[in-house]
Amino acid sequence: MGVMWGLISVAIASLAQLSLGFAMMRLPSIAHPLAFISGLGAFNAATLALFAGLAGYLVSVFCWQKTLHMLALSKAYALLSLSYVLVWVASMLLPGLQGAFSLKAMLGVLCIMAGVMLIFLPARS
């Protein structure tokens, strides 16, 4: 049950990260506070994505809390790294997120996946 909550948390956090990325590429830079605030007041897709991403992180924290009650931290923490994989893949597949493929990034993703698999392998008796 703890793994399920962890995977739900990872999925929601990944969606939240993608949503925030979408919003930040479309909203005015926060370096220009007045333009940024007026951009938030426009209530367009970027503003909705920003608030959806923030809400997603909040829900993800609730799921993560449930995970930590049911799963050892050493295993739960390994699940978080799957979010990097999901966001990387989604940023390349979804239009407008400007993700780029590179062999170096692919090697990093493979290392993450191998590490998670090693942590979740059953212990020898």
Swiss-Prot record:
Coiled coil: none annotated. One of its GO terms (biological process) is lipid A biosynthetic process. The chain crosses the membrane at residues 3-23, 34-54, 77-97, 101-121. GO terms for cellular component: plasma membrane. It is found in: Cell inner membrane. Keywords: Cell inner membrane, Cell membrane, Lipid A biosynthesis, Lipid biosynthesis, Lipid metabolism, Lipopolysaccharide biosynthesis, Membrane, Transmembrane, Transmembrane helix, Transport. Disulfide bonds: none annotated. The keyword Cell membrane applies. GO terms for molecular function: carbohydrate derivative transmembrane transporter activity. InterPro entries: Flippase_ArnF, Small_drug/metabolite_transptr. It is a multi-pass membrane protein. Its main location: membrane. Residues 1-2, 55-76, 122-125 are cytoplasmic. Residues 24-33, 98-100 are periplasmic. Pathway: Bacterial outer membrane biogenesis; lipopolysaccharide biosynthesis. Signal peptide: none annotated. Belongs to the ArnF family. NCBIfam families: PRK02971.1-2 (NF002816). Translocates 4-amino-4-deoxy-L-arabinose-phosphoundecaprenol (alpha-L-Ara4N-phosphoundecaprenol) from the cytoplasmic to the periplasmic side of the inner membrane. Heterodimer of ArnE and ArnF. This is Probable 4-amino-4-deoxy-L-arabinose-phosphoundecaprenol flippase subunit ArnF. It comes from Salmonella typhi.
